[in-house]
């Protein structure tokens, strides 16, 4: 029943995402990550560019306070296999299958530069929209 309620908001999510057309034109690849906030009874959609980099930042949602703590052990284990994984190159990026866990940051170019240059800082904030169900 819970999953059916989440699926019912799919059309409304598409409408909200379409409102961000100017945002979408700035980024070729976007990841639509859906997290459910049970306290607020909303579906929080995190709309962020995909960055195939590792970080020890804490990933945090500004709306529902969801967060994924940094996992340095996972980062170090995966770094030894980086040469075996494909890289994003032009139109092939949408068809590539990645085994690595992609860490993501918020949507502004300034924060992307900060993310890549100061990966030891914590507190990544996502661009979020919420749709009630």
From Swiss-Prot:
Cellular component aspect of the GO annotation: plasma membrane
Family: Belongs to the UPF0768 family.
Protein name stated in the entry: UPF0768 protein C977.18
UniProt source species: Schizosaccharomyces pombe (strain 972 / ATCC 24843) (Fission yeast)
């Amino acid at each position: 029943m819970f999953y059916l309620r989440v699926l019912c908001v799919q059309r409304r999510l598409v409408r909200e995402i379409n409102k961000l057309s100017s945002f979408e034109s700035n980024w070729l690849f976007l990841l639509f990550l859906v997290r459910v906030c049970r306290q607020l009874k909303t579906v929080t959609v995190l709309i962020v560019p995909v960055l195939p980099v590792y970080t020890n930042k804490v990933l945090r949602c500004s709306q529902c306070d969801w967060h994924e703590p940094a996992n340095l052990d996972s980062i170090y284990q995966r770094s030894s296999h980086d040469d075996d994984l494909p890289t994003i190159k032009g139109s092939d990026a949408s068809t590539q299958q990645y085994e690595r866990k992609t860490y993501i940051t918020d949507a502004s170019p300034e924060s992307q530069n900060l993310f890549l240059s100061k990966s030891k800082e914590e507190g990544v904030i996502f661009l979020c929209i919420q749709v009630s169900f």
